[in-house]
């Protein structure tokens, strides 16, 4: 529980990010993917498969929303049982907000109006939607879903849903999250293909579009979430290491580490200057080194996350990372 005003404000900020991300995911599903049966996995894919068996057209939307509701609750309970209370708390907000957002956008006429204006992406006209309609729906849907998931991650939460299976696979089968996510979403897409394609060959296009949407979504998550965490570690061997160190400390505001080393070729004593900085400072440091010592030997290594003074607090570390450390895995 938050202990002071600052911690309360931080908690509220993170909850708002999770809510924003969840609503973006729901908007991408309801506004772009679901109307054209674009199955990109997740709860949306499960709901699309189930509503296929509902013959009454007037009941399909209700069936879609009910499946999302039930599945969200079921996966949350599964997470509570097999992963633990910490995971359940982490996904509680999204597990409640996602079904609510799905109902909201389903009932909101503005969503249909907006998507219809974007090249009639979800409107069946003439002989039906063209391949271009499916492609645009897959791209826009993937962008909204991927952006929403990334924002949820930035808020320190999780979208829940089928992600629960991903963490279960990681915990019990020791499968990496990226591979587990591919298996889970891939299984939903293939299931949709097997269920829908025999009844209507036209379902091949939305299923293939779902694969495209899944890649777009992953790219957005990589760009927004992973990209926002990117920092650099640089090792510098230079006769001007003292000047470089002072510049970094005084102008950039970063600390430096001086590491004694010995050259393997000549056997002379050298200094390796190590600096860790974020991507926004990359150009300044690189330009300064090139100016003061063009012959400096420099190696840049990109890191996905840095914890400690001047960077992220250890307290904000994701609970799933903590679990892996406790298990002795990296």
Predicted features and spans:
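Core subunits and conserved enzymes of cellular information-processing
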Residues: 2-240
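Positively charged, small/polar-rich N-terminal and surface patches that mediate targeting and assembly
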Residues: 172, 178-194, 201-212, 218-330
